[in-house]
Structure formats: structure tokens, C-alpha cells
Design a protein with these regions (language model features):
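N-terminal core-binding DNA-recognition domain of tyrosine site-specific recombinases/integrases
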Residues: 6, 28, 117-121, 137-143
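DNA/chromatin major-groove-contacting recognition/catalytic segments
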Residues: 6, 15, 19-23, 73-79, ...
Length: 201
């Protein structure tokens, strides 16, 4: 990702995402797909390749080991984008419950079944529908990944920890998101003020 692309990066905050997602609760598969994308930072191909065997609800872990594409009308499973893309992603309890509820609603799901058995085109259309219904600013589906990374940066996690979670080859890629939170400089100055006053320097 070049500097120009980084500067143009658009994201949703947690509240913006919630408003969007609330408008898609009529389609469970769509709603869950966006929940997973926003709260894990998975790439769209990684999400669509997930099978129930890859999702350990008891251990609260998703294993990423493949990617999905739809080529010439056929489902194609390929290796992940990069070696670092092979990873395990821990998921929060609320997402475990969302996936379990969804799984319980299905008729006899098998381990080899895809969790989200749709295409990227379907999810892109559903995203357009959700943005129209919610009035949210328009972003691309890949921007849900940007939103997750930006959320983690804002929560104070290190670039290394974030890079491992989202499968970046280098922490340099993760650092390119930092410009999204210019107030961090102000926070740093404020904390230095507080530190000086506490120590009576």
C-alpha cells in the first residue's frame, strides 16, 4: 500500500459499523459476514474460504489457511496471500456466540461446509444495501479490514501484535495506518504533562 493509498484510506468507527450492521439483520449470513470482517480484520478471501472445521468456538480461535475466489463460475480455493497470512486469530466471546447462533440455525452443518457460502460480489451488493439503508458513508468491503486495524491502533496495541493478528508480512504496513489517529500526538503530550506533574520533576 503506497502513501497515496494510505492517505485515501476510509474507515468506519465502531458506532458507524454498528449502525450499518443493524440494517442487515434481516439476512443472517450477510450480517455475520460483516461482523467477522470488522471484528477480526480477515481479508474477504480468507473469510469466504472458512469452513466450520477452521472455527474452534470452544477455544475461541479461527484458523486461516486458505483463500477463496470465484473464477469463471467456479469456486476456487488457493493458499493464503502470503506466508504470514497462515495464522490463528482469537475472537471475542460475543463473536463466538454470534457464530454459534448462526450455526445452530443451519440444517446439519458439516465440518467441511463453508461458514459464509456466498461470493464477494454478493457481499459487495449487500454492503451497498446496508450503506443505503443506514446512511453511512460509502467505503469498500476491504475497508472493514482497515477499520479493524485502525480500531486496534486506537486501543493502544503494538504494531507487531496487530501485524501478527491480521497477517501483515511487515510491521511497516501496519505503521501506515497510524496517520488515521492524529490525536495520538496530543495524547502523548498530555501524558508527558501528567507524568512530569506526578513525579514532581
Amino acid at each position: 500500500m503506497g502513501k497515496a493509498k494510505a492517505d485515501e484510506m476510509e474507515i468506519w468507527t465502531k458506532d458507524e459499523f454498528q449502525q450499518f450492521a443493524d440494517c442487515l439483520m434481516d439476512k443472517r449470513v450477510s450480517w455475520l459476514a460483516y461482523q467477522i470482517l470488522f471484528w477480526t480484520g480477515l481479508r474477504i478471501g480468507e473469510l469466504l474460504a472458512l469452513t466450520f472445521a477452521d472455527v474452534d468456538l470452544e477455544g475461541k480461535v479461527i484458523t486461516i489457511n486458505k483463500s477463496y475466489q470465484r473464477l469463471k463460475g467456479k469456486d476456487v480455493i488457493t493458499p493464503p496471500k502470503t506466508p504470514k497470512s497462515n495464522r490463528k486469530v482469537n475472537i471475542p466471546q460475543f463473536l463466538v456466540e454470534d457464530i454459534q447462533d448462526y450455526k445452530d440455525s443451519l440444517y446439519d452443518p458439516q465440518l467441511e461446509d463453508r461458514v459464509i457460502p456466498v461470493t464477494k460480489t454478493f457481499l459487495e451488493k449487500e454492503m451497498q444495501r446496508g450503506m443505503k439503508l443506514s446512511g453511512m458513508k460509502k467505503i469498500h468491503i476491504h475497508s472493514l479490514r482497515h477499520s479493524h486495524i485502525s480500531l486496534l491502533i486506537d486501543m493502544g496495541f503494538t504494531a507487531l501484535a496487530i501485524a501478527e493478528r491480521v497477517g501483515h508480512e511487515s510491521i511497516d504496513i501496519t505503521y501506515r495506518y497510524a496517520h488515521l489517529f492524529p490525536t495520538r500526538q496530543v495524547e502523548m503530550a498530555d501524558k508527558l504533562d501528567s507524568l512530569k506533574n506526578e513525579k514532581g520533576v
